[in-house]
Amino acid sequence: MKIHVFLFVLFFFLVPIATRVKCAVKDTYSCFIMRGKCRHECHDFEKPIGFCTKLNANCYM
């Protein structure tokens, strides 16, 4: 019974956290590695990015 509870907690609580960390890593790559391609406002086909402190950018081309 304890194994079922453990798997339930693992699946429903820890998996979404891992997904958010994965997105944060992707945003960090977009902001810091592709530094010259970030801008403060989104234009036509640019993708919005998340938290970016160094550039304070919202989009990348």
From Swiss-Prot:
Residues 1-23 form the signal peptide. Its main location: secreted. Pfam families: Defensin_beta_2. Keywords: Antibiotic, Antimicrobial, Defensin, Disulfide bond, Secreted, Signal. It is found in: Secreted. GO terms for cellular component: extracellular space. One of its GO terms (molecular function) is chemoattractant activity. It comes from the Eukaryota. Disulfide bonds join 31-59, 38-52. One of its GO terms (biological process) is defense response to bacterium. Has antibacterial activity. Belongs to the beta-defensin family. This is Beta-defensin 133. It comes from Homo sapiens (Human). The gene is DEFB133.
